[in-house]
Amino acid sequence: MYCRVVHVKAVSEIQLKMITSYIETTMMPRNLSAGQISGEVFEKSPTEIFTVSKFYDKETANKIMGLMKDEIREIAKGCKMSLLEGPRIIEGKSLND
């Protein structure tokens, strides 16, 4: 399992709403159909989100990043973005699962 976390800080609430809508309607469906296991978007503040994407392996993560390269560059022009990623080394599971 490989995970990628992206933090996005927009300059305004409306800009963040546009980015979030684009992720929901375009990027996430395409990425999931291309092999991404799951994707979640979390609100940190009215102008900040972070996304958590899971992949089977780094190769799949890089393939999907390649699909988004131009879009990411365009989004990054108007806001701040940071990226954390790596392979899972520990998995915890709830006793209720």
Predicted regions and their residues:
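Short S/T/G/P-rich N-terminal loop/turn motif that feeds into the first structured element of a domain
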Residues: 1-50, 55-70, 77, 81-97
